[in-house]
Amino acid sequence: MRFSVFLPAIAALSSAVAAQRSCGSIPHKAFSNELKEAMENSRTSSFSNVTSNVTINTYFHVITDGNTGKISDETLQKQIAVLNSDYKASGFSFKLVASDSVDNPTWAAGEDDMGMKSALRKGGYDTLNVYFVPMLREGLLGFCYFPMKNPSEGQKIKDGCVINSNSVPGGSAQNYNEGKTTTHEVGHFMGLYHVFNEQEGNCQQDGDMIEDTPVQGSASSGCPTGKDSCPQQGVDSIHNYMDYSYDSCLTEFSPGQIKRMQMLWQFRAGSGSGSVTRPRPKPPVLMDYEHRL
């Protein structure tokens, strides 16, 4: 069942341009603690070996509401190519094992995240699942879950990245339609923070705890050459995939970020490659969108 009053609204939202990148990835406190422990242990022989040259099995799930949100196979191939190009220097590559398309108005509206993933997720904790959704709350371009050392079954199911389908190569999200949103969100999947401090103007802390990304007090927009938001040495990392610059401006991960990803891959590899145990999904809950508009 669909609510006709909702369809024009979602169609309008799906074609709206993104004024500024907005990411909904928030690290769990447990991840922050585990990261600090891993950084400390990295100085010992038991943690000296970092992972490199890993191929990550990847599944794309395209969520639609009728014609809204449809993505061609050609575009999905372009998206995986962008991902592989951007991560080439890291030693990680992504193999698109399969893709599927599901018509579900509830999921297309960014609702029932757990139900969607319970029904569609494939592979183990070391598998990347990407869900392309045409409308996300609060204008988000995407969000993704950070790796956990000992994830619960529920955390394994919720794992993966949800991406605004308008941000794929050739999409309608102006300035954010070269596929770099997926690159950015997968950075969180690999254990990376934003290069900027989440508290606007905070220059007292190194937000991502990586030495070769200068302290940055604000997210970037556009491609502001020479931007320097903090007095410490080094200008802002406007070309870094973990900033908020336009897609055309994003070109790199730092060596320190690459080392961080390689170090934290053990969180995912250590949790096994077997399929996640999924609960029986509940029928989608159809909200009364007439009262939301």
Curated annotation (Swiss-Prot):
List cystine links.
C223-C249
What are the binding positions for Zn(2+) in this chain?
H184, H188
According to the record, the residues making up region (Disordered) are: 270-293
Highest taxon, organism lineage = Eukaryota
Q: Quick one: where is this thing mainly located?
A: secreted
Cellular localisation: Secreted
Q: What is this protein called?
A: Extracellular metalloprotease MGYG_00389
Q: Which organism is it from?
A: Arthroderma gypseum (strain ATCC MYA-4604 / CBS 118893)
